[in-house]
Each structure stands twice: as structure tokens, then as C-alpha cells.
Amino acid sequence: MDRLIALLKNNARISLEDAAKQLDLTPETVAATIDDLEKRGVLRAYQAIVNEDKLEADQVTAVIEVKVTPEREGGFDHIATRICRYPEVSSMYLMSGQYDLMLFVEGPDLRTVATFVSARLSSIPGVTGTATHFRLKTYKHHGVLMESEHDNERLQVSP
């Protein structure tokens, strides 16, 4: 099962036949295992990894560190559940260290993300502080390099 998950992480579009060959299983066994993983919630989604820097559309991504006061009943879970329901929040993690939650937030521009942080996120009871960091460039995402070797080639300049 771990080998199948590794294959799917590397290429979610791999055919049942190719996965079966690599794992020395039958396509039917691979299909049944994938079905079981989906039903148990192990496989949550199949997504494309997109190089946002190559798209024409403007999209702003920010990492937001959030300090919160944990609740007596439920700790961080209640406030985390509330925050992750916002559509702007694409990913969210409970962290160790100087802040409690790490959010990845997306919006059409800096102002929209800043307004989300100042008007919506900071006003939630229990949120005691935030620090926002805007993504400038992505070099690697989910194990995938965003530039090939020749993307960075520069023209030689001679005097």
C-alpha cells in the first residue's frame, strides 16, 4: 500500500496497468486498493501541481502565522475549524514554535489578502496575533521543481 501511495503522489494519473506492473500486482488489485484508500479517507483528492508564475492571471499567495489562545475544551481545534472554513484559506497546519497555526491564503491581489487578515482573521475571538508573508516566487512545490534547467539560461552579454 505504501508503494502504491508513493506512485500516486508522484503521478496521480498513472494508469492501473502501469501501477500494477511497477508493483507486481494485477490492475484489479490496484483498483481495489485505491477504492479502499478513497473510502477510508486516506486519498482525499487528486490535484495538478501548477506553476503559478507561468500563468497570466494574477494570484497572490501568503503564508500567515497565527497566534491563538487555545480553548479549555478542544484546545486549538475549534478555532482552527472556524478559520479553515474561509474560502481564502487553501491549507492550514497546527505548528510547534512561536506561532500556533500556519495558513496558506490565496487572493486576487495584496489588498484582498491584507483585508482578509485585518478584517476577518484578526477579529476572530482567540486570535492574538498574525504575521503575513507574501510569496514572491516558487522554486519547488510538493516535491516538483518549478523551473527546468533551461528556464534559467541567460543570454551572454559581451562588451
Stretches with model-predicted labels:
Residues 1-159:
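A compositional/biophysical signature of low hydrophobicity enriched in polar/charged and small residues
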